[in-house]
């Protein structure tokens, strides 16, 4: 009947009316694998994206209640440079959410919640790409983070550029595929019909097959080997020359041959060619088309194909050219003096826990303030108020002017500053 749709598995209701946890329905009870130890103690001032402040650092220790030997779960992770961190926005304050949100980057304009990274979502889950500094035992040390101290972490996944980063796609006319004629030709590349939103025209899906090396990327040994193989094959019979060229170009990738091809005599080479007529025709570096005298070489057109590629990752203009301008950051002489005193440490003073020096702490503060961490409310209605935040052990007080932010004072933060009501963190300028 019309109007009927296939329904998924229905959730089993508990006596209280709530849906019971079930893997098939997606109703899960999550358990954090650990709680983050971060240089950011509160939401105020924390970067909204991990790329804003590369100096920010954090440590995640895997809980022993998850694994008896946490270090076993991290085995092999040290071989990656970056990791995905899946976490919970545990400081939202409420579980309410709306279909449209006002991200600070849009300076008051509304857009759909799923087109943003707003923490107020149906499932308050965040995703961060962080740099992996090191792995020690059951602890992971990260940098370039945007999560606050005590954030519950749900999962860690390695970042793999070949899988996680969009690849440049080649126009369909540039694809050279050599296969036997048959009905499979019409359906072999069905993904070519997919459209990329924001691109000028349809592009074929990216193939995960290994692409041939460009000529300029080959080593001298590879080039000399191919030259010797090709020159020796010129003395073979004309009818076998096509297959001989195919063999020579393919020999660089064949690891099962008992002896190199340049040690074969003309008769041995001819007999070997006659035995391997059913060999696949796809080779690295070149393609020889049967029934045609022309040879289509991939490496010759590699540079031209690269110029014709169209990037498949498209973002709206408000992401790259946001209405909120980047601010200039300056420090008063007293603030710079406070920062040097704070980094000197001493017997009665605590030094930085996450930053390595005062200069690094200064760079982190500049990066955070240049992105304007204020909310839209504070930008429009609290322009004459001081703004302060905590990073590492530094409690920073600053104010914002027309296109700049100025750091007025930096003092030791005895305890993490966590303000429940945002209005409590506003102090009248001059008071």
Curated annotation (Swiss-Prot):
Assigned EC number: 2.1.1.-
Keyword annotations: Methyltransferase, RNA-binding, S-adenosyl-L-methionine, Transferase, tRNA processing
EC main group: transferase
Binding positions (S-adenosyl-L-methionine): 47-49, 90-91, 117, 127, 148-151
GO BP term, pick one: tRNA methylation
Occurrences of domain TsaA-like (ranges): 30-168
Catalytic activity: N(6)-L-threonylcarbamoyladenosine(37) in tRNA + S-adenosyl-L-methionine = N(6)-methyl,N(6)-L-threonylcarbamoyladenosine(37) in tRNA + S-adenosyl-L-homocysteine + H(+)
Superkingdom of the organism of origin: Eukaryota
InterPro entries xrefs: TrmO-like_N, UPF0066_cons_site, YaeB-like, YaeB-like_sf, YaeB_N_sf
Start and end residues of each stretch annotated as Disordered: 167-189, 201-243
Family as reported in the entry's similarity comment: Belongs to the tRNA methyltransferase O family.
Role of this protein: S-adenosyl-L-methionine-dependent methyltransferase responsible for the addition of the methyl group in the formation of N6-methyl-N6-threonylcarbamoyladenosine at position 37 (m(6)t(6)A37) of the tRNA anticodon loop of tRNA(Ser)(GCU). The methyl group of m(6)t(6)A37 may improve the efficiency of the tRNA decoding ability. May bind to tRNA.
UniProt-recorded name of the protein: tRNA (adenine(37)-N6)-methyltransferase
Provenance organism: Rattus norvegicus (Rat)
